[in-house]
């Protein structure tokens, strides 16, 4: 993903940190977006780094303990973008955004757990009777962390993890519509990625079938969770099939590791702001 003014300074760093920051990555028709004053209440947002997508300098300050709030941690606070797709959707719906998403979040792997985000939302009363929407987008980090396990087992374990979390959310936000938001298209769908965009519409094409495998697995994990919990799945794949990391500059929403042509964004190898704005509209209309 792109970075703003600091991107040229961190280009050399991007390749080494991209895999660890890969936190990754559907469209449901719905009513027209109401005006900002049409609804009262809030939206609660849970997810990994593709949701949180904090500015790189804020992410680094949190990791290094240089923020006034101290070191970031999924149990206390996490830096997030003011313009990620969840907040974009909340603004379009006239809802206050309570964003608990955090980079690196996992469910069935070792690491910062989604349950900790739910704990924070309950403890801070972000989840309440006035909550109208709850967005959940997580799971990609669990795909590569469970690489080699049968996909059916990973999907089963993910559903078993998510069921009690959804039950907790429902108990504290009984009036909310809960939505599992799928990941957008990352690879070209044929097992290729484009990591280095070195000139206008000039890039490599690198076979990396694992990315396609992982994004497809993450998609089905979220579909399964929505079905098992009686919640809604928002499918972003159809709406972003032409916006993957090998797409032309004017369409690309998932940038390469080095990419100065897809448009502005925050974290390397994560969604562009254009992508957040686009997906935010889809979620708001869903």
Language model features: what each stretch is:
Residues 1-37:
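Secretory targeting and sorting signals
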Residues 33-45, 114-130, 163-175, 284:
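Short amphipathic alpha-helices and their capping/turn segments at secondary-structure boundaries
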Residues 39-80:
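Short glycine-rich His-centered loop
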Residues 42-53, 96-101, 108, 132-137, ...:
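Structural recognition of the beta-strand scaffold that forms the well-ordered cores
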Residues 63-153:
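Conserved SGNH/GDSL esterase-like catalytic core that processes O-acyl groups on lipids
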Residues 65-83, 154-157, 202-216, 268:
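A short acidic, glycine-rich active-site loop
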Residues 126-147, 153-170, 179, 184-233:
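Conserved N-terminal glycine/acidic-rich loop preference
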Residues 186-286:
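Catalytic His-Asp segment of secreted/periplasmic serine-dependent ester chemistry enzymes
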């Amino acid at each position: 993903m792109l970075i703003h003014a600091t991107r040229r300074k961190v280009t050399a760093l991007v390749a080494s940190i991209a895999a660890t920051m890969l936190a990754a990555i559907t469209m449901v028709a719905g009513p027209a977006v109401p005006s900002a004053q049409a609804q009262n209440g809030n939206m609660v947002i849970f997810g990994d780094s593709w949701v949180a997508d904090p500015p790189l300098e804020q992410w680094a300050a949190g990791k290094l303990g240089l923020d006034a709030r101290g070191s970031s941690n999924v149990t206390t606070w996490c830096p997030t973008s003011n313009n990620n797709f969840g907040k974009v959707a909340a603004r379009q719906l006239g809802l206050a955004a309570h964003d608990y998403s955090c980079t690196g979040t996992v469910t069935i792997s070792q690491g910062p757990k989604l349950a900790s985000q739910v704990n924070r939302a309950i403890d801070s009363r972000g989840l309440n009777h006035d909550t109208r929407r709850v967005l959940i987008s997580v799971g990609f980090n669990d795909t590569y962390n469970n690489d080699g396990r049968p996909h059916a087992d990973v999907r089963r374990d993910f559903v078993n993890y998510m069921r009690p979390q959804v039950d907790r959310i429902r108990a504290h936000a009984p009036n909310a519509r809960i939505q599992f938001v799928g990941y957008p298209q990352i690879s070209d769908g044929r097992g290729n990625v484009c990591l280095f965009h070195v000139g206008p519409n000039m890039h490599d094409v690198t076979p990396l079938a694992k990315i396609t495998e992982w994004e497809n697995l993450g998609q089905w994990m979220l579909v399964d969770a929505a079905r098992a919990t009686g919640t809604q799945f928002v499918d972003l794949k159809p709406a972003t099939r032409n916006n993957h990391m090998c797409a032309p500059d004017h369409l690309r929403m998932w940038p390469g590791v080095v990419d100065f042509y897809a448009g502005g964004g925050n974290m390397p190898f994560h969604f562009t702001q254009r992508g957040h704005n686009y997906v935010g509209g889809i979620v708001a209309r869903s």
